[in-house]
């Protein structure tokens, strides 16, 4: 996309950018305000009518790109030199929460054959609703533009991270995972009332529920994958489960082989931090052929059970042996129901550290360790 030089007396926010809008998110870009469907740019001429884009189509949507095409009257097509694309986050329409109110959202592109690809992680975020409208423009000899009326406004939503993006994220997580330590149980902390409710109303069986929105905004498992959250990190000096927890003073401990064995598949789900030095890796364990397994197979990178940097299960002469990464906090999601009778419920002797909870935690978008160069 080329951003042409415009007349100095043009007003914003409806003026096109003078250079590619790099390193800016839509939160820091001024929304275009239009009265009806006409351009209000004082430096843009409307000497001759140009075709108005209509029947706009959005296709090939990814987490940080999309293709756009439209129909228009072919009579003046030869005079069109540029397209103006007005792109806004739907949630920020009519918002005034901007630091840089003089920066337009309008993207300017040379008139290329349609469909045209719009790509850029500096203004597109994954799983986010946007509105888009288009003008056709003709560059004049004095550097100003003749423009069409605005098209209708179209809404669309960007996609989640693909497996390719998640693999990039996984490789960054592997770089800091550290050495592997033995462990023997998965554990889940909750309040006493939770376990009482499971016994009384669910026949002693914990049921999967939708994952919250913690972690990367583009993670395909957030609010979609159903599972049960477990931990497995151990105290460095004892090899036993950590004494403290942010989630409750009661804990169920399940022998590792009950949840993680050769009849399960293991997937990488996410890598994030919460403005702290701690980094979290989300892994998914799914019984082979289960609905959770089918969900993950389509969306997440699959890991070898015995050879990965985060969580392993290996067969030795004494049986299955389990290891977990020392330098990241593992959040393990098991996708099937779990009977409390598989393990033991008891009160912990440590503290309930609420400040360490990751419930609906937002990822630090500025962290160089756990972000990749696509929408955050």
UniProtKB/Swiss-Prot annotation:
<dbReference type="InterPro" id="IPR045545">
    <property type="entry name" value="PHYIP/PHIPL_C"/>
</dbReference>
<protein>
    <recommendedName>
        <fullName>Phytanoyl-CoA hydroxylase-interacting protein-like</fullName>
    </recommendedName>
</protein>
<dbReference type="Pfam" id="PF19281">
    <property type="entry name" value="PHYHIP_C"/>
</dbReference>
<dbReference type="InterPro" id="IPR036116">
    <property type="entry name" value="FN3_sf"/>
</dbReference>
<comment type="function">
    <text>May play a role in the development of the central system.</text>
</comment>
<dbReference type="Pfam" id="PF00041">
    <property type="entry name" value="fn3"/>
</dbReference>
<dbReference type="InterPro" id="IPR003961">
    <property type="entry name" value="FN3_dom"/>
</dbReference>
<dbReference type="InterPro" id="IPR013783">
    <property type="entry name" value="Ig-like_fold"/>
</dbReference>
<dbReference type="InterPro" id="IPR042868">
    <property type="entry name" value="PHYHIP/PHYHIPL"/>
</dbReference>
<comment type="similarity">
    <text>Belongs to the PHYHIP family.</text>
</comment>
<feature type="domain" description="Fibronectin type-III">
    <location>
        <begin position="52"/>
        <end position="161"/>
    </location>
</feature>
<dbReference type="GO" id="GO:0005737">
    <property type="term" value="C:cytoplasm"/>
</dbReference>
